[in-house]
Design a protein with these regions (language model features):
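Active-site-adjacent substructure of cysteine-protease-like catalytic cores
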Residues: 95-151
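Short, small-residue-biased leader/transition segments that mark boundaries at the very start
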Residues: 1-5
Length: 199
């Protein structure tokens, strides 16, 4: 079966778990996919306030005097800085899962209404946010798909900020191939799940 997803207004079904009405944004700089992914997550939780790409980027620790000096993008630990800087969020990340995660982990967070930010080798290094998962109604995982909010949505003739990826295929490419040192959270299966702290 092939699906045409209705994007923002999609609702969960027997096979599809989706964050309905997740709003997307397009990054305004080549380097800002990480902070734009964070912006979308903040918006999802109605916590955006006056934050923007520049103000969120300023919350990241400096990479000066490290092997990544001059790198404008966002490492895992810098993405964590963003949510710690905004405040009021609990964070689960690949730092908590040294053996990695798999499809059922992602489905679990989505079913709790939590978007999953990921950093992988798309475009040679890119942050996106998984907002949906479709089993396609089969027992096999090899036809499952992720729906992502993509701040660099330039390749499908519809720059609406949504994309679809074969889930298993993405998981086997879920790496930055050593681009980030362990001191910055490493390079493999980089993900971040932020959710509002219980009050």
């Amino acid at each position: 079966a092939s699906y045409v997803y209705k994007r923002q207004n999609m609702e969960s079904t027997d096979t599809l778990t989706v964050l309905t009405h997740f709003r997307t944004m397009q990054q305004t700089s080549e380097w800002s996919c990480g902070v734009t992914a964070a912006l979308m997550v903040l918006d999802w939780y109605d916590a955006l306030g006056d934050w923007n790409e520049e103000s969120l980027a300023a919350l990241r620790h400096s990479l000066d005097s490290t092997e990544l000096e001059g790198y404008p993008g966002t490492t895992l630990n810098q993405a964590i800085d963003i949510f710690n800087g905004v405040g009021g969020f609990d964070i689960i990340s690949s730092n908590d899962y040294p053996d990695g995660i798999w499809l059922d982990d992602i489905q679990g967070w989505l079913s709790e209404g939590k978007p999953v930010m990921i950093c992988w080798n798309d475009w040679g290094g890119h942050w996106q946010t998984i907002i949906g998962y479709d089993t396609m109604g089969t027992e096999n995982e090899n036809d499952d798909v992720f729906l992502v909010a993509d701040s660099y949505d330039t390749t499908d003739h519809n720059q609406d900020g949504y994309g679809i990826y074969p889930a298993e295929r993405l998981m086997y490419n879920f790496t930055m191939y050593g681009a980030f040192p362990e001191s910055e959270g490493g390079s493999d299966m980089l993900f971040l799940v932020a959710s509002p702290s219980a009050k």
